[in-house]
Amino acid sequence: MISKKLSLILLAVVFVIEGVSLFWIRGDYRSTMLDGAEYEVPASIDFKGDFYGRNYLPIYIPLTEAPWKGTATPEKGEEIYLSFDKNGEGLLEITGASDRKPGGMYIITRVVSASDGLVHFRFPADRMYMLPEQLKKLSVVELSERVQLKDKSGKKTETRMKNDLTALIHIKDGRVVISKVLANGSPVEQTYTTVGKNLSVKYA
């Protein structure tokens, strides 16, 4: 009888802890979305798995390594701080990583691996939440289409994504959330046609 009561108490404690954690996570998400500084980053959409059976759009942001500017080489799983700036195209780029909190804006993430003066990590935002009915309207064919283009020399042909995808992110106190995904500068939820850019292309 005592064991059963103890089990129920422990179960209740677990539910309370999970509820409090979820409350804080949602609070951080809302705070970052509303008050965070906005930046644009390169992005791609992950169409694998049950794409339409979710309430979010899975996003890959290819910012995954930086020069290590900290003290000792970090261990896998260690929390680190990323410094960043805007490149010539106005997109956010990671300029360094450290175990010490930098002045100004920064991003918090964890180490995947480190070697030869570089640290590798996962970008700490990988989804944009959407209503299921919005998600079902997205044109997978349009957003995943690839085309063949001549390079700058005009001698070689390269296969690239037809649409130029980027994401708008908000950053606050090291936390990051994705607010929008853009296809050629327009929100993906408004991209339902196969017009794309005005380019001379050959379909791959």
Where do the PLM segments sit?
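N-terminal hydrophobic targeting signals that begin at the initiator methionine
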Residues: M1-S3
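Hydrophobic membrane-insertion alpha-helices, especially the h-region
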Residues: K5-W24
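Alpha-helical transmembrane signal-anchor/signal-peptide segments
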Residues: D28-S44
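Extracytoplasmic
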Residues: G36-E38, Y56-P58, G77-E79, K162-D164
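Short extracytoplasmic
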Residues: V41-G70
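A mature extracytoplasmic/lumenal domain signature
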Residues: I45, N55, L63, K86-G88, ...
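Short, compositionally biased
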Residues: G70-G90, S98-R100
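Extracytoplasmic/periplasmic terminal helices and flexible tails
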Residues: S83-D85, L92-A97, I108-A204
